[in-house]
Amino acid sequence: MSNMQQKTDVILIGAGIMSATLGSLLKELAPEWEIKVFEKLASAGEESSNEWNNAGTGHSALCELNYTSEKSDGSIDISKAVKVNEQFQLSRQFWAYLVKSKLIRNPQDFIMPLPHMSLVQGEKNVEFLKNRFEALSKNPLFQGMEFSDAPETLKKWLPLIMEGRTSNEPMAATKIDSGTDVNFGALTRMLFDYLKTKDVELNYKHSVENIKRTKNGLWEVKVHDMNSGKIEHHTAKFVFIGGGGGSLPLLQKTGIPESKHIGGFPVSGLFMVCKNQKVVEQHHAKVYGKAKVGAPPMSVPHLDTRYIDNKKALLFGPFAGFSPKFLKTGSNLDLIGSVKPNNVLTMLAAGVKEMGLTKYLIQQVMLSHEKRMEELREFIPNAKSEDWDIVVAGQRVQVIKDTDAGGKGTLQFGTEVVSAADGSIAALLGASPGASTAVHVMLEVLEKCFPSRMVEWEGKIKEMIPSYGISLTENPRLFQDLHTSTGRTLGLNEKETVHN
Protein backbone atom coordinates (compact mmCIF):
# COMPACT_ATOMS: atom_id res chain seq x y z
CA MET A 1 0.00 0.00 0.00
CA SER A 2 1.32 3.44 -0.87
CA ASN A 3 1.09 6.90 0.63
CA MET A 4 -2.17 7.64 -1.21
CA GLN A 5 -5.15 8.66 0.92
CA GLN A 6 -7.93 6.14 1.45
CA LYS A 7 -11.37 7.35 2.52
CA THR A 8 -13.79 5.61 4.83
CA ASP A 9 -16.74 6.53 7.05
CA VAL A 10 -15.46 5.43 10.46
CA ILE A 11 -12.02 4.62 11.86
CA LEU A 12 -11.71 2.76 15.16
CA ILE A 13 -8.27 2.88 16.78
CA GLY A 14 -7.52 -0.07 19.03
CA ALA A 15 -9.07 -3.55 18.85
CA GLY A 16 -10.26 -3.77 22.45
CA ILE A 17 -13.69 -4.17 24.02
CA MET A 18 -14.62 -0.49 23.47
CA SER A 19 -13.97 -0.42 19.71
CA ALA A 20 -15.57 -3.87 19.41
CA THR A 21 -18.71 -2.60 21.16
CA LEU A 22 -18.91 0.65 19.20
CA GLY A 23 -18.30 -1.17 15.91
CA SER A 24 -21.04 -3.70 16.74
CA LEU A 25 -23.53 -0.96 17.65
CA LEU A 26 -22.77 1.00 14.48
CA LYS A 27 -23.08 -2.07 12.23
CA GLU A 28 -26.57 -2.68 13.64
CA LEU A 29 -27.58 1.00 13.41
CA ALA A 30 -25.89 2.02 10.13
CA PRO A 31 -24.96 -1.22 8.30
CA GLU A 32 -24.01 0.68 5.15
CA TRP A 33 -21.19 2.61 6.85
CA GLU A 34 -17.64 1.56 6.03
CA ILE A 35 -15.56 0.87 9.13
CA LYS A 36 -11.80 0.33 9.45
CA VAL A 37 -10.04 -0.84 12.60
CA PHE A 38 -6.32 -0.28 13.29
CA GLU A 39 -4.60 -2.28 16.02
CA LYS A 40 -0.90 -2.14 16.87
CA LEU A 41 -0.77 -5.73 18.15
CA ALA A 42 -1.15 -8.96 16.17
CA SER A 43 -4.71 -9.75 17.29
CA ALA A 44 -7.78 -8.34 19.06
CA GLY A 45 -8.23 -7.97 22.82
CA GLU A 46 -4.57 -8.30 23.76
CA GLU A 47 -4.02 -5.22 25.95
CA SER A 48 -6.43 -4.04 28.68
CA SER A 49 -9.25 -6.28 27.40
CA ASN A 50 -7.18 -9.46 27.65
CA GLU A 51 -8.52 -11.86 30.27
CA TRP A 52 -5.23 -11.83 32.22
CA ASN A 53 -4.99 -8.02 32.16
CA ASN A 54 -8.17 -7.19 34.10
CA ALA A 55 -10.14 -8.62 37.02
CA GLY A 56 -12.96 -10.02 34.86
CA THR A 57 -15.60 -8.74 37.26
CA GLY A 58 -18.97 -7.89 35.75
CA HIS A 59 -18.93 -4.64 37.76
CA SER A 60 -22.46 -4.08 39.00
CA ALA A 61 -21.65 -2.82 42.52
CA LEU A 62 -22.93 -6.04 44.11
CA CYS A 63 -19.72 -6.49 46.11
CA GLU A 64 -17.41 -3.51 45.43
CA LEU A 65 -17.52 -1.43 48.60
CA ASN A 66 -15.94 1.65 47.01
CA TYR A 67 -19.21 2.30 45.12
CA THR A 68 -21.07 2.94 48.40
CA SER A 69 -19.83 5.67 50.72
CA GLU A 70 -20.72 6.46 54.30
CA LYS A 71 -22.15 9.93 54.86
CA SER A 72 -21.30 12.03 57.91
CA ASP A 73 -24.58 11.00 59.61
CA GLY A 74 -23.70 7.31 59.20
CA SER A 75 -26.20 6.64 56.40
CA ILE A 76 -25.02 5.04 53.15
CA ASP A 77 -24.97 6.81 49.78
CA ILE A 78 -25.86 4.15 47.19
CA SER A 79 -26.25 6.48 44.18
CA LYS A 80 -22.95 5.43 42.57
CA ALA A 81 -23.74 1.73 43.11
CA VAL A 82 -27.14 2.12 41.45
CA LYS A 83 -25.57 3.97 38.52
CA VAL A 84 -22.90 1.29 37.95
CA ASN A 85 -25.48 -1.50 38.21
CA GLU A 86 -27.85 0.21 35.74
CA GLN A 87 -24.93 0.58 33.32
CA PHE A 88 -23.99 -3.09 33.59
CA GLN A 89 -27.60 -4.06 32.81
CA LEU A 90 -27.22 -2.28 29.44
CA SER A 91 -24.17 -4.42 28.64
CA ARG A 92 -26.00 -7.57 29.70
CA GLN A 93 -28.99 -6.71 27.48
CA PHE A 94 -26.81 -5.98 24.43
CA TRP A 95 -24.84 -9.20 24.85
CA ALA A 96 -28.12 -11.13 25.13
CA TYR A 97 -29.37 -9.45 21.92
CA LEU A 98 -26.18 -10.48 20.10
CA VAL A 99 -26.55 -14.09 21.30
CA LYS A 100 -30.28 -14.25 20.52
CA SER A 101 -29.64 -12.84 17.04
CA LYS A 102 -26.91 -15.49 16.58
CA LEU A 103 -24.34 -12.75 15.92
CA ILE A 104 -22.18 -14.30 18.64
CA ARG A 105 -22.50 -17.83 20.02
CA ASN A 106 -21.59 -19.86 23.11
CA PRO A 107 -22.10 -17.20 25.82
CA GLN A 108 -20.53 -19.56 28.39
CA ASP A 109 -17.21 -18.81 26.67
CA PHE A 110 -17.35 -15.20 27.90
CA ILE A 111 -19.78 -14.96 30.83
CA MET A 112 -20.40 -17.23 33.82
CA PRO A 113 -22.65 -16.84 36.87
CA LEU A 114 -20.69 -16.37 40.06
CA PRO A 115 -21.69 -15.21 43.55
CA HIS A 116 -20.41 -11.73 44.39
CA MET A 117 -19.50 -11.24 48.04
CA SER A 118 -18.22 -8.45 50.29
CA LEU A 119 -16.15 -9.42 53.32
CA VAL A 120 -15.11 -7.17 56.21
CA GLN A 121 -13.43 -7.48 59.62
CA GLY A 122 -13.72 -5.31 62.72
CA GLU A 123 -16.74 -3.95 64.53
CA LYS A 124 -16.89 -0.65 62.64
CA ASN A 125 -16.61 -2.33 59.23
CA VAL A 126 -19.26 -4.93 60.16
CA GLU A 127 -21.63 -2.09 61.06
CA PHE A 128 -20.84 -0.35 57.74
CA LEU A 129 -21.53 -3.55 55.77
CA LYS A 130 -24.83 -4.14 57.57
CA ASN A 131 -25.92 -0.55 56.86
CA ARG A 132 -24.85 -0.97 53.23
CA PHE A 133 -26.81 -4.21 52.94
CA GLU A 134 -29.94 -2.59 54.40
CA ALA A 135 -29.66 0.41 52.05
CA LEU A 136 -29.09 -1.71 48.93
CA SER A 137 -31.80 -4.26 49.82
CA LYS A 138 -34.46 -1.56 49.39
CA ASN A 139 -33.44 -1.22 45.72
CA PRO A 140 -34.83 -3.75 43.18
CA LEU A 141 -31.43 -4.05 41.43
CA PHE A 142 -29.94 -5.66 44.54
CA GLN A 143 -32.73 -8.12 45.40
CA GLY A 144 -31.49 -11.49 46.64
CA MET A 145 -28.56 -10.11 48.62
CA GLU A 146 -27.94 -11.83 51.97
CA PHE A 147 -26.02 -10.59 55.00
CA SER A 148 -24.45 -12.65 57.77
CA ASP A 149 -22.07 -12.12 60.67
CA ALA A 150 -22.61 -15.67 61.99
CA PRO A 151 -19.36 -17.70 61.90
CA GLU A 152 -21.18 -20.91 60.89
CA THR A 153 -22.81 -19.21 57.88
CA LEU A 154 -19.51 -17.60 56.87
CA LYS A 155 -17.83 -21.04 57.00
CA LYS A 156 -20.49 -22.36 54.64
CA TRP A 157 -20.20 -19.39 52.26
CA LEU A 158 -16.41 -19.03 52.42
CA PRO A 159 -14.80 -22.36 53.37
CA LEU A 160 -11.34 -21.48 52.06
CA ILE A 161 -11.30 -18.06 53.73
CA MET A 162 -12.66 -19.24 57.10
CA GLU A 163 -10.49 -22.36 57.44
CA GLY A 164 -7.66 -21.93 59.96
CA ARG A 165 -8.86 -18.51 61.11
CA THR A 166 -7.87 -17.93 64.74
CA SER A 167 -8.78 -14.27 65.28
CA ASN A 168 -11.87 -13.48 67.36
CA GLU A 169 -12.35 -10.19 65.53
CA PRO A 170 -15.95 -9.85 64.30
CA MET A 171 -16.46 -10.58 60.59
CA ALA A 172 -19.39 -10.19 58.22
CA ALA A 173 -20.17 -10.83 54.57
CA THR A 174 -22.86 -10.16 52.02
CA LYS A 175 -23.62 -12.64 49.26
CA ILE A 176 -25.63 -12.33 46.06
CA ASP A 177 -25.82 -15.14 43.52
CA SER A 178 -26.59 -13.00 40.46
CA GLY A 179 -22.99 -11.81 40.00
CA THR A 180 -20.90 -12.71 36.96
CA ASP A 181 -17.36 -13.40 35.83
CA VAL A 182 -16.75 -11.94 32.37
CA ASN A 183 -13.92 -12.89 30.04
CA PHE A 184 -13.60 -9.60 28.17
CA GLY A 185 -10.79 -10.94 25.99
CA ALA A 186 -12.98 -13.76 24.67
CA LEU A 187 -15.93 -11.38 24.19
CA THR A 188 -13.75 -8.89 22.30
CA ARG A 189 -12.51 -11.61 19.94
CA MET A 190 -16.09 -12.83 19.35
CA LEU A 191 -17.27 -9.31 18.50
CA PHE A 192 -14.44 -8.77 16.02
CA ASP A 193 -15.16 -12.16 14.42
CA TYR A 194 -18.75 -10.95 13.95
CA LEU A 195 -17.59 -7.56 12.58
CA LYS A 196 -15.38 -9.34 10.06
CA THR A 197 -18.48 -11.04 8.62
CA LYS A 198 -20.01 -7.56 8.23
CA ASP A 199 -17.10 -6.42 6.01
CA VAL A 200 -15.39 -4.36 8.70
CA GLU A 201 -11.73 -4.05 7.68
CA LEU A 202 -9.52 -5.28 10.53
CA ASN A 203 -5.89 -4.17 10.29
CA TYR A 204 -3.60 -5.80 12.84
CA LYS A 205 0.04 -4.80 13.36
CA HIS A 206 -0.94 -1.31 12.18
CA SER A 207 0.25 1.46 14.51
CA VAL A 208 -1.44 4.89 14.37
CA GLU A 209 1.32 7.53 14.36
CA ASN A 210 -0.64 10.76 13.94
CA ILE A 211 -4.16 12.21 13.62
CA LYS A 212 -4.80 15.59 12.05
CA ARG A 213 -7.70 17.56 10.61
CA THR A 214 -7.85 18.10 6.85
CA LYS A 215 -9.02 21.33 5.21
CA ASN A 216 -12.34 19.75 4.26
CA GLY A 217 -13.10 18.80 7.88
CA LEU A 218 -12.24 15.10 7.69
CA TRP A 219 -9.71 13.40 9.96
CA GLU A 220 -6.51 12.06 8.44
CA VAL A 221 -4.94 9.15 10.28
CA LYS A 222 -1.30 8.31 9.59
CA VAL A 223 -0.73 4.58 10.00
CA HIS A 224 2.48 2.57 10.08
CA ASP A 225 1.93 -0.90 8.58
CA MET A 226 4.32 -2.94 10.72
CA ASN A 227 3.99 -5.91 8.36
CA SER A 228 5.35 -4.10 5.29
CA GLY A 229 7.04 -1.09 6.92
CA LYS A 230 4.98 1.27 4.74
CA ILE A 231 3.16 4.41 5.84
CA GLU A 232 -0.54 4.72 4.98
CA HIS A 233 -2.89 7.70 5.18
CA HIS A 234 -6.58 7.09 5.83
CA THR A 235 -9.31 9.73 6.12
CA ALA A 236 -12.67 9.39 7.85
CA LYS A 237 -15.67 11.47 8.84
CA PHE A 238 -15.55 9.99 12.35
CA VAL A 239 -12.68 8.61 14.43
CA PHE A 240 -12.89 6.79 17.75
CA ILE A 241 -9.72 6.44 19.82
CA GLY A 242 -10.15 3.32 21.93
CA GLY A 243 -6.52 2.51 22.54
CA GLY A 244 -6.62 2.01 26.32
CA GLY A 245 -3.61 3.73 27.88
CA GLY A 246 -2.50 4.72 24.37
CA SER A 247 -5.57 6.93 23.87
CA LEU A 248 -4.25 10.04 25.67
CA PRO A 249 -1.14 10.55 23.47
CA LEU A 250 -3.29 10.11 20.33
CA LEU A 251 -5.96 12.49 21.65
CA GLN A 252 -3.22 15.08 22.26
CA LYS A 253 -2.13 14.78 18.62
CA THR A 254 -5.61 15.81 17.41
CA GLY A 255 -5.13 19.32 18.82
CA ILE A 256 -8.82 19.67 19.70
CA PRO A 257 -9.45 22.15 22.56
CA GLU A 258 -11.05 19.38 24.62
CA SER A 259 -7.70 17.53 24.71
CA LYS A 260 -5.95 20.34 26.60
CA HIS A 261 -5.22 20.37 30.35
CA ILE A 262 -5.59 16.59 30.62
CA GLY A 263 -2.79 14.38 31.90
CA GLY A 264 -2.42 10.70 32.64
CA PHE A 265 -0.76 8.72 35.41
CA PRO A 266 0.04 5.06 34.68
CA VAL A 267 -0.51 2.38 37.33
CA SER A 268 0.29 -1.25 36.65
CA GLY A 269 -1.52 -4.11 38.33
CA LEU A 270 -0.27 -7.45 39.60
CA PHE A 271 -2.30 -10.46 40.69
CA MET A 272 -1.35 -13.62 42.51
CA VAL A 273 -2.59 -16.75 40.74
CA CYS A 274 -3.07 -20.11 42.45
CA LYS A 275 -1.39 -23.07 40.74
CA ASN A 276 -2.81 -25.71 43.11
CA GLN A 277 -6.08 -26.89 41.54
CA LYS A 278 -7.21 -28.47 44.85
CA VAL A 279 -7.15 -24.99 46.43
CA VAL A 280 -8.86 -23.45 43.38
CA GLU A 281 -11.79 -25.87 43.76
CA GLN A 282 -12.39 -24.83 47.39
CA HIS A 283 -13.53 -21.32 46.43
CA HIS A 284 -16.47 -20.25 44.28
CA ALA A 285 -17.08 -16.49 44.37
CA LYS A 286 -15.67 -13.04 43.80
CA VAL A 287 -14.96 -11.76 47.30
CA TYR A 288 -14.16 -8.06 47.68
CA GLY A 289 -12.69 -6.61 50.85
CA LYS A 290 -12.35 -3.02 52.00
CA ALA A 291 -9.45 -0.80 50.96
CA LYS A 292 -7.14 0.13 53.82
CA VAL A 293 -7.51 3.65 55.22
CA GLY A 294 -5.79 6.15 52.92
CA ALA A 295 -5.35 3.65 50.08
CA PRO A 296 -6.72 4.56 46.61
CA PRO A 297 -9.90 2.91 45.21
CA MET A 298 -7.91 0.70 42.82
CA SER A 299 -6.33 -1.01 45.83
CA VAL A 300 -9.48 -2.84 47.03
CA PRO A 301 -8.30 -6.44 47.64
CA HIS A 302 -10.34 -9.29 46.16
CA LEU A 303 -10.15 -13.07 45.88
CA ASP A 304 -11.71 -14.17 42.62
CA THR A 305 -12.82 -17.35 41.00
CA ARG A 306 -12.19 -16.82 37.28
CA TYR A 307 -13.04 -18.81 34.16
CA ILE A 308 -10.20 -18.51 31.66
CA ASP A 309 -10.04 -20.77 28.59
CA ASN A 310 -13.07 -22.58 30.10
CA LYS A 311 -10.97 -23.57 33.12
CA LYS A 312 -11.54 -22.47 36.71
CA ALA A 313 -8.78 -20.27 38.16
CA LEU A 314 -8.21 -18.40 41.44
CA LEU A 315 -6.65 -14.93 41.57
CA PHE A 316 -5.90 -12.51 44.41
CA GLY A 317 -5.00 -8.85 44.17
CA PRO A 318 -4.52 -6.32 42.88
CA PHE A 319 -1.09 -5.21 43.94
CA ALA A 320 0.01 -1.98 42.30
CA GLY A 321 3.22 -1.48 40.40
CA PHE A 322 4.70 1.48 38.63
CA SER A 323 5.91 1.75 35.06
CA PRO A 324 6.10 4.94 32.97
CA LYS A 325 4.50 2.97 30.10
CA PHE A 326 0.90 3.81 29.13
CA LEU A 327 0.42 0.32 27.67
CA LYS A 328 1.84 -3.02 28.71
CA THR A 329 3.47 -3.08 25.27
CA GLY A 330 4.24 0.67 25.39
CA SER A 331 7.40 2.75 25.75
CA ASN A 332 9.24 3.96 28.87
CA LEU A 333 8.95 7.45 27.37
CA ASP A 334 5.11 7.42 27.37
CA LEU A 335 4.66 9.36 30.63
CA ILE A 336 7.25 12.06 29.94
CA GLY A 337 6.06 12.33 26.32
CA SER A 338 2.51 13.06 27.49
CA VAL A 339 3.61 16.19 29.40
CA LYS A 340 2.78 19.21 27.22
CA PRO A 341 2.86 22.98 27.82
CA ASN A 342 -0.95 22.93 28.23
CA ASN A 343 -1.00 20.19 30.92
CA VAL A 344 2.32 20.58 32.76
CA LEU A 345 0.76 22.64 35.59
CA THR A 346 -2.11 20.15 35.85
CA MET A 347 0.41 17.29 36.15
CA LEU A 348 2.55 19.13 38.72
CA ALA A 349 -0.51 20.01 40.82
CA ALA A 350 -1.52 16.34 40.83
CA GLY A 351 2.00 15.37 41.92
CA VAL A 352 1.72 17.64 44.96
CA LYS A 353 -1.85 16.56 45.78
CA GLU A 354 -1.33 12.84 45.37
CA MET A 355 1.61 12.26 47.69
CA GLY A 356 -0.47 9.54 49.36
CA LEU A 357 -0.81 7.66 46.07
CA THR A 358 2.90 8.08 45.35
CA LYS A 359 3.77 6.69 48.79
CA TYR A 360 1.32 3.79 48.28
CA LEU A 361 2.87 2.91 44.89
CA ILE A 362 6.42 3.00 46.30
CA GLN A 363 5.37 0.68 49.14
CA GLN A 364 3.66 -1.68 46.69
CA VAL A 365 6.65 -1.82 44.34
CA MET A 366 8.92 -2.74 47.28
CA LEU A 367 6.78 -5.72 48.36
CA SER A 368 8.50 -9.11 48.33
CA HIS A 369 6.67 -12.35 47.48
CA GLU A 370 6.44 -13.15 51.19
CA LYS A 371 4.98 -9.69 51.99
CA ARG A 372 2.34 -10.26 49.31
CA MET A 373 1.65 -13.67 50.85
CA GLU A 374 1.04 -11.91 54.19
CA GLU A 375 -1.68 -9.82 52.52
CA LEU A 376 -3.14 -12.92 50.89
CA ARG A 377 -3.22 -14.67 54.28
CA GLU A 378 -5.58 -11.96 55.54
CA PHE A 379 -8.01 -13.66 53.11
CA ILE A 380 -6.70 -17.25 53.18
CA PRO A 381 -4.98 -17.94 56.53
CA ASN A 382 -3.60 -21.31 55.35
CA ALA A 383 -2.21 -20.06 52.00
CA LYS A 384 1.14 -21.65 51.10
CA SER A 385 3.80 -19.64 49.22
CA GLU A 386 4.56 -22.50 46.84
CA ASP A 387 0.91 -22.55 45.62
CA TRP A 388 0.95 -18.98 44.30
CA ASP A 389 2.67 -17.19 41.42
CA ILE A 390 2.56 -13.53 40.40
CA VAL A 391 1.01 -12.36 37.12
CA VAL A 392 1.54 -8.89 35.69
CA ALA A 393 -1.85 -7.52 34.62
CA GLY A 394 -2.55 -4.52 32.38
CA GLN A 395 -1.56 -0.86 32.61
CA ARG A 396 -4.24 1.63 33.65
CA VAL A 397 -3.80 5.32 32.94
CA GLN A 398 -5.68 7.34 35.55
CA VAL A 399 -6.91 10.65 34.13
CA ILE A 400 -5.65 13.88 35.70
CA LYS A 401 -7.60 17.04 34.94
CA ASP A 402 -8.70 20.36 36.35
CA THR A 403 -12.17 20.21 37.90
CA ASP A 404 -14.44 22.71 39.64
CA ALA A 405 -14.85 20.41 42.62
CA GLY A 406 -11.26 19.23 43.02
CA GLY A 407 -9.33 22.15 41.54
CA LYS A 408 -6.19 21.88 39.44
CA GLY A 409 -4.64 18.46 38.87
CA THR A 410 -7.41 16.25 40.22
CA LEU A 411 -6.99 12.49 39.80
CA GLN A 412 -10.05 10.82 38.26
CA PHE A 413 -10.94 7.19 38.96
CA GLY A 414 -13.68 6.60 36.38
CA THR A 415 -14.09 6.07 32.65
CA GLU A 416 -14.46 9.22 30.57
CA VAL A 417 -15.36 10.12 26.98
CA VAL A 418 -13.63 13.20 25.53
CA SER A 419 -15.07 14.38 22.22
CA ALA A 420 -14.72 17.32 19.84
CA ALA A 421 -17.49 19.92 19.91
CA ASP A 422 -18.67 18.85 16.44
CA GLY A 423 -18.68 15.15 17.39
CA SER A 424 -16.25 14.15 14.63
CA ILE A 425 -13.74 12.51 16.98
CA ALA A 426 -13.96 10.91 20.43
CA ALA A 427 -11.54 9.19 22.78
CA LEU A 428 -12.05 6.99 25.79
CA LEU A 429 -9.83 7.65 28.81
CA GLY A 430 -9.62 6.23 32.31
CA ALA A 431 -9.98 2.91 34.06
CA SER A 432 -12.58 1.20 36.28
CA PRO A 433 -15.42 0.25 35.86
CA GLY A 434 -14.26 0.19 32.23
CA ALA A 435 -15.21 -2.86 30.19
CA SER A 436 -18.30 -3.74 32.27
CA THR A 437 -19.92 -0.47 31.23
CA ALA A 438 -18.71 -0.62 27.60
CA VAL A 439 -22.24 -0.48 26.16
CA HIS A 440 -23.28 2.51 28.29
CA VAL A 441 -20.06 4.36 27.42
CA MET A 442 -20.37 3.66 23.69
CA LEU A 443 -24.02 4.80 23.73
CA GLU A 444 -22.68 8.02 25.27
CA VAL A 445 -20.26 8.28 22.32
CA LEU A 446 -23.21 7.89 19.90
CA GLU A 447 -25.23 10.55 21.76
CA LYS A 448 -22.32 13.01 21.79
CA CYS A 449 -21.10 12.38 18.26
CA PHE A 450 -24.28 11.58 16.29
CA PRO A 451 -27.02 13.66 18.01
CA SER A 452 -28.94 14.20 14.75
CA ARG A 453 -29.18 10.42 14.19
CA MET A 454 -30.41 9.44 17.65
CA VAL A 455 -34.13 9.90 16.90
CA GLU A 456 -33.78 7.70 13.81
CA TRP A 457 -31.73 5.10 15.73
CA GLU A 458 -33.76 5.03 18.95
CA GLY A 459 -36.13 2.24 17.87
CA LYS A 460 -33.27 -0.10 16.96
CA ILE A 461 -31.34 0.80 20.12
CA LYS A 462 -34.39 -0.10 22.24
CA GLU A 463 -34.77 -3.38 20.35
CA MET A 464 -31.17 -4.23 21.29
CA ILE A 465 -31.16 -2.62 24.75
CA PRO A 466 -34.76 -2.43 26.04
CA SER A 467 -33.97 -0.34 29.13
CA TYR A 468 -32.15 2.38 27.14
CA GLY A 469 -33.29 5.75 28.52
CA ILE A 470 -35.26 4.10 31.34
CA SER A 471 -34.40 3.86 35.04
CA LEU A 472 -34.66 0.21 36.06
CA THR A 473 -34.68 1.27 39.71
CA GLU A 474 -37.97 3.03 39.04
CA ASN A 475 -39.29 0.13 36.93
CA PRO A 476 -38.73 -2.98 39.07
CA ARG A 477 -41.02 -5.20 36.99
CA LEU A 478 -39.13 -4.35 33.79
CA PHE A 479 -35.85 -5.05 35.60
CA GLN A 480 -37.11 -8.45 36.77
CA ASP A 481 -38.34 -9.37 33.27
CA LEU A 482 -35.08 -8.29 31.61
CA HIS A 483 -32.90 -9.90 34.26
CA THR A 484 -34.73 -13.20 33.79
CA SER A 485 -34.77 -13.10 29.96
CA THR A 486 -31.13 -12.01 29.56
CA GLY A 487 -30.10 -14.58 32.16
CA ARG A 488 -31.87 -17.29 30.16
CA THR A 489 -30.26 -16.20 26.87
CA LEU A 490 -26.78 -15.92 28.38
CA GLY A 491 -27.13 -19.26 30.17
CA LEU A 492 -26.86 -17.73 33.64
CA ASN A 493 -30.11 -18.69 35.38
CA GLU A 494 -29.80 -22.47 35.44
CA LYS A 495 -26.12 -22.33 36.41
CA GLU A 496 -26.90 -19.88 39.23
CA THR A 497 -29.18 -22.55 40.69
CA VAL A 498 -26.59 -25.32 40.30
CA HIS A 499 -23.98 -23.45 42.34
CA ASN A 500 -26.27 -22.27 45.16
Swiss-Prot record:
Its EC number is 1.1.5.4. Keywords: FAD, Flavoprotein, Oxidoreductase, Tricarboxylic acid cycle. One of its GO terms (biological process) is tricarboxylic acid cycle. Disulfide bonds: none annotated. Its cofactor is FAD. It is an enzyme of class 1 (oxidoreductase). GO terms for molecular function: 2-hydroxyglutarate dehydrogenase activity; L-malate dehydrogenase (quinone) activity. The keyword Oxidoreductase applies. It catalyses: (S)-malate + a quinone = a quinol + oxaloacetate. InterPro entries: FAD/NAD-bd_sf (IPR036188), MQO (IPR006231). Pathway: Carbohydrate metabolism; tricarboxylic acid cycle; oxaloacetate from (S)-malate (quinone route): step 1/1. NCBIfam families: mal_quin_oxido, PRK05257.1-1, PRK05257.1-3, PRK05257.1-4, PRK05257.2-1, PRK05257.2-4, PRK05257.3-1, PRK05257.3-2. Belongs to the MQO family. This is Probable malate:quinone oxidoreductase. The lineage of its organism: Bacteria, Bacillati, Bacillota, Bacilli, Bacillales. The gene is mqo.
